[in-house]
Swiss-Prot record:
DNA annealing helicase and endonuclease required to maintain genome stability at stalled or collapsed replication forks by facilitating fork restart and limiting inappropriate recombination that could occur during template switching events. Recruited to the sites of stalled DNA replication by polyubiquitinated PCNA and acts as a structure-specific endonuclease that cleaves the replication fork D-loop intermediate, generating an accessible 3'-OH group in the template of the leading strand, which is amenable to extension by DNA polymerase. The gene is ZRANB3. A motif (PIP-box) lies at residues 519-526. This is DNA annealing helicase and endonuclease ZRANB3. Changing Y632A: Abolishes interaction with 'Lys-63'-linked polyubiquitin. Changing K65R: Abolishes ATPase activity. Abolishes endonuclease activity. Changing W625A: Abolishes interaction with 'Lys-63'-linked polyubiquitin. Residues 1011-1051 form the HNH domain. It comes from Homo sapiens. A motif (APIM motif) lies at residues 1074-1078. The modification (Microbial infection) S-methylcysteine is found at C630. Residues 325-481 form the Helicase C-terminal domain. ATP binds at D59, E60, M61, G62, L63, G64, K65, T66.
Length: 1079
């Protein structure tokens, strides 16, 4: 192989970041980014720059490759646009890092590709973030756009995703990376187990540098002919000449280990825990081993497919056989209340067994497997990192073993092994990375007499190969063997059986009518029952329960929430919110929906109007409170008025809180005094008034220390020194823009000029100002930012999402929301969803008005009518129909069509199904698949699916509200997950003392038999469909738990019934109540 032998190794120049020369080389970086870099990270950036921006950064996991790549590409920002290719679950963390370290980029300049047709903003964005999952053979529109864009700078994160020469994503990415002028490949495991996995990455950076594939395979992969049965096969899975390969790689790859450059990081301690399995648990596995030995004794006795199928079956049987012992081990670890740890597994059966162990121990946990969406994974990671009550993370080795940070954990348990050391080390370093403050203990559970012992030996052999190739020395997974006597209890573990849905449930596992009659809602013990009391909603009861418990609690900042974990306790709350959520005011309007706010504002404002008259009333004893509606003095323990049954929390005000409140009717004459007088109102009243009259509060320019203190956003005394600064001009007003993809808020001047800084509102609430320059410690700026954070926090998550997606610049988020709402088209539709028939009618009407024709598009782009079709340039056949005759066909068979009827204008441009505007130019339409040209933009696509597809609608609402009821704040999704993952025999106990006890018997038993999300929470229309709220956007939707949804539906049904009766009565006579109305 002459090309390989003639390679001249370029010695890596010795670079020390202590010298002034290296510091001068990094002067181009933003000050904050340069100050954050560690010395070895500066070395990595300079290494790449000296190779003209084409290299591989292969530092060990957890050493900060992301920030190095950002620094490298920033040097070449004049050559952007920049393409960043990452695993799909890391799109948003990468976007967060880009916005954090390059604040000069505006939100509009960063484009996160959402689907295979989302290419409209690619040509106008400076940074494009793309997930590997979209690089498939059918993504023709996306592939064409990537090739046409000609990205000059490319980052490929976790570049070992390109290890296979035959994978579609490798073939798509290879020409894009080769064509780019600068290309940075990032991976902590360039080769997961074999040298063959390096070839595609090297070929992407330097084509033909190591020769052709056959030359490389023969030289470094020990390629040879091998027979599987009678079939010869070219085997490239070996390794040879590894020292030479290591020397050649050092010219294009920089790799540092944590033991070399991060000596202050606490150590990683591995421990191997072998144990014996009970004979009953390993019965099936022993049978498979006998079959395996029979095949191995007979040469050429089985085909490759048979052998691999047997190994896969043994792998799964090993998981089931050791699941009982793994459960006992997890329970043993949970006995230490101070431990937070990760559990990694591969098979769903093992993940299920681990989850059951945590549920049986009544511990809060998170679980990430392949079914969890990318956005939800980030939410779960934040929960584990920040919530001290979430002690266990149950993770899939493949789904959560790369790119995520779990430094809050001090222990890692491997319930199963995997086939290569790369995945194992990646999983280990989720906890052992920069930011870890304690040593990480890693436990490998090895079941003797199973596939584990064989896999452990295989992992060490592969580790020697990868260590020699990447690090220049032989390595193995160093793990001390644990004390056998200490783990003897594992061999006595009970055999575990999968939670099979087809298993027949015993009668004891289901609710019966007798038990249902005995059930009591736990909240009934805290609420006195008068003789005549109307039925109250679950929202009112739960909210009152939280408020009462908040008063009694020693920590007034914590919300007493309902707990679904300790379900056997008679006095436990029903759900436990995240710590972050608990830090907010317990009566914050951000948790209220528009409909709820509307119900609460009216009596509250009325009570303010009556306050003036009550000021002259003398103070009452402490044990009583006065109703503001009927003035009756009630016992302090009653949560509602004994006379008029008005709830104490909504329309009643304590006498001692009614100081200096003016009549609402005088507000118009003295608007300047309103903001000062509102300060004396209680928190709930102040926030409700802020929602009812946002304009006044937004226009108020006086921000007194008292309001700041009430919101928990006080200025530090030491900050008074920042009264003047020459580094930044002082503006009396700031503009803001919310990022579309992260929680960050970008700051602009009042003229709309970007100030190259951004922040996270939650950080400001926690008094963390490190993301902002020191100049923003000025008192004027602090006041403006604090005021923004207060207003922003008062909005619900759904309202914040509306502002983010708008991309607008604004001063006040409340006023911005009002402006966006005004601009939206007001529609009054009593139909729930858009149907294909609605689309067909709209398309035909468009064609009749402006000309053109209609066509039937399907996902397969197959012709539906052989008589009316047109052959496009790329050979795809799409039927073109006559708009005057197709309507009759649709009325005969309205739901048999698998596609949509789309209008095409006279120029041949297909029109958007949502807005009837051209989706693309004619030349592009010929190249694109007809199915990809349904919509003109991602916005129209989302709006269309939200209005026509229930599953898509639920998914989008879930992304924002995470399955938390917006009326009673119950985390219904968490209860669903616990019930789904629990053994069927224990599901009844889980449901027994929760908010679901109000549901009918059959519904409860269905939850036990076959739990689904729809049994626990629903997406409800705030403005009901019958009232004109159908086919709405997300701002008219909210999450409701099943109980609240049922009660709200019943209330709405009663209202509709009354309206119908009144309408019917008005046809035959006049309503007598009209004579009683005062004119």
């Amino acid at each position: 192989m002459p090309r390989v032998h003639n390679i001249k190794k370029s010695l890596t120049p010795h670079i020390s970041c202590v010298t002034n020369e290296s510091d001068n080389l990094l002067d181009f970086l933003p000050d904050r980014l340069r100050a954050k870099l560690l010395p070895f990270q500066k070395d990595g950036i300079i290494f790449a720059l000296k190779r003209n921006g084409r290299c591989m950064v292969a530092d060990e996991m957890g050493l900060g490759k992301t920030i190095q790549a950002i620094g490298i590409t920033y040097f070449y920002k004049e050559e952007w646009p920049l393409l960043i290719v990452v695993p799909s679950s890391l799109r948003y963390p990468w976007t967060e890092e880009i916005e954090k370290w390059i604040p000069e980029l505006s939100p509009e300049e960063i484009n996160v590709i959402q689907n295979k047709t989302d290419v409209r903003r690619m040509s106008t964005s400076k940074v494009t973030v793309l997930g590997y999952g979209l690089l498939t053979a059918d993504a023709k529109t996306l592939i064409d756009a990537l090739n046409n864009q000609n990205f000059k700078v490319v980052i490929v994160d976790e570049s070992h995703y390109m290890k296979s020469r035959n994978a579609t994503r490798s073939r798509i990415l290879l020409p894009i990376v080769q064509k780019a002028r600068r290309a940075i490949l990032l991976t902590g495991t360039p080769a997961l187990g074999r040298p063959e996995e390096l070839f595609m990455q090297i070929e992407a950076l330097f084509p033909q540098k190591f020769g052709r594939w056959t030359d490389y395979a023969k030289r470094y992969c020990n390629a040879h002919i091998r027979y599987f049965g009678k079939r010869p096969q070219w085997d490239c899975r070996g390794a040879s000449n590894l020292n030479e390969l290591h020397q050649l790689l050092s010219d294009i790859m920089i790799r540092r280990l944590k033991t070399e450059v991060l000596t202050q990081l606490p150590p990683k301690v591995r421990q191997r825990i072998p144990f014996d399995l009970p004979s009953a648990a390993a019965k099936e596995l022993n049978t498979s081993f006998e079959e395996w030995e029979k095949i191995m004794r007979t040469p050429n006795s089985g085909a490759m497919e048979t052998v691999m199928g047997l190994i896969t079956r043994m792998f799964k049987q090993t998981a089931i056989a050791k699941a009982g012992a793994v459960k006992d081990y997890i329970k043993m670890m949970l006995q230490n209340d101070s431990l937070k740890f990760l559990v990694f597994a591969h098979h769903l059966s093992m993940l299920q067994a681990c989850t059951e162990a945590v549920i049986e121990n009544k511990t809060r946990y998170i679980r990430i497997d392949g079914s969890v969406s990318s956005s939800e994974r980030i939410h779960l990671v934040n929960q584990f990192q920040k919530d001290p009550d979430t002690r266990v993370a149950i993770l899939s080795i493949q789904a959560a073993g790369q790119g995520l940070t779990f430094t809050a954990a001090s222990h890692v348990v491997f319930a199963e092994l995997y086939w290569d050391p790369g995945h194992i080390k990646q999983a280990e370093d989720r906890a052992h990375r920069i930011g870890q403050c304690s040593s990480v203990n890693i436990h490998y559970l090895i079941a003797n007499g199973t596939l584990d012992t064989l896999m452990w030996g295989m992992l060490n052999r592969k580790a020697q190969v990868t260590g020699s190739t990447l690090n220049g020395r032989k390595e193995k997974i160093q793990a001390e063997e644990g004390d056998k006597e200490k783990w003897d209890f594992l061999q006595f573990a009970e055999a575990w059986t999968p939670n099979d849905s087809s298993e027949e449930l015993r009668k004891e596992a289901l609710f019966t009518h007798f038990e249902k009659e005995k059930q009591h809602d736990i909240r009934s013990f805290f609420v006195p029952q008068p003789k005549k009391r109307q039925l109250m909603t679950s929202c009112d009861e739960s909210k009152r329960f939280r408020e009462e418990n908040t008063v009694v609690s020693s920590d007034p900042t914590k919300t007493a929430a309902r707990d679904i974990i300790d379900y056997e306790s008679d006095v436990e709350p029903e759900t436990k919110r995240l710590k972050l959520a608990a830090s907010e005011d317990h009566c914050s309007p951000s948790e209220e929906t528009p409909s709820q706010s509307k119900q609460i504002r009216t009596p509250l404002v009325e009570s303010v109007q009556e306050a003036k008259a009550q000021l002259t009333t003398p103070a009452f004893p402490v044990e009583g409170w006065q109703c503001s509606l009927c003035t009756y003095i009630n016992n302090s323990e009653l949560p509602y008025c004994e006379m008029c049954e008005t709830p104490q929390g909504s329309a009643v005000m304590q006498i001692d809180s009614l100081n200096h409140i003016q009549d609402k009717n005088e507000k118009d004459d003295s608007q300047k005094d309103t903001s000062k007088k509102v300060q004396t109102i209680s928190d709930c009243e102040k926030q409700a008034l802020a929602q009812s009259e946002p304009g006044q509060l937004a226009d108020s320019k006086e921000e007194t220390p008292k309001i700041e203190k009430e919101d928990g956003l006080t200025s530090q005394p030491g900050n008074e020194q920042w009264k003047s600064s020459d580094t930044l001009p002082v503006y009396d007003t700031l503009m803001f823009c919310a990022s579309r993809n992260t929680d960050r808020i970008h700051i602009y001047t009042k003229d709309g000029k970007q100030m190259s800084c951004n922040f996270i509102p939650l950080d400001i609430k926690l008094d963390l100002w490190e993301d902002l320059p020191a100049s923003f410690q000025l008192k004027q700026y602090r006041s403006l930012i604090l005021r923004f954070v207060r207003e922003w926090s008062s909005l619900t998550a759904m309202k914040q999402r509306i502002i983010r997606k708008s991309g607008q610049l604004f001063c006040s988020p409340i006023l911005a929301l009002e402006e966006i709402t005004k601009q939206q088209t007001k529609q009054n539709c009593t139909k729930r969803y858009i149907t294909k028939e609605d689309v067909a009618v709209a398309s035909m009407d468009k064609v009749k008005n402006v000309g053109g024709h209609v066509r039937l598009i399907t996902k397969e782009s197959r012709p539906r009518d052989p008589f009316t079709k047109k052959l496009l340039e790329d050979g795809a056949c799409v039927p073109f129909l006559n708009p005057y005759t197709v309507q009759a066909d649709l009325t005969v068979k309205p739901s048999t069509s698998k596609g949509y009827l789309q209008a095409v204008d006279n120029e041949g441009n297909p029109l958007c199904l949502r807005c009837q505007q051209p989706t693309c130019q004619t030349k592009q339409a010929c190249k694109a698949n007809s199915w990809d040209s349904r919509f003109c933009s991602l916005k129209c696509q989302e709006e269309f699916w939200i209005r026509s597809n229930n599953s898509y609608l639920r998914a989008k609402v879930f992304e924002t509200e995470h399955g938390v009821c917006q009326l009673c704040n119950v985390n219904a999704q968490e209860l669903f997950l616990r019930l789904r993952d629990a053994p069927k025999s224990q599901r009844k106990n889980l449901l027994y003392a929760t908010w679901t006890s109000k549901l009918p018997l059959e519904q409860l038993n269905e939850m036990i038999r076959n739990p689904g999300e729809g049994h626990f929470w629903q997406v409800d229309h705030i403005k009901p469909v019958y009232g004109g709220g159908g086919q709405c956007s997300l701002d008219n939707l909210q999450t409701l738990c099943t109980v609240c949804h049922k009660e709200r539906t019943a209330r709405q049904a009663k209202e509709r019934s009354q309206v119908r009766r009144q309408s019917l009565a008005s046809k035959h006579g006049s309503d007598i109540t009209r004579f009683l109305v005062k004119k």
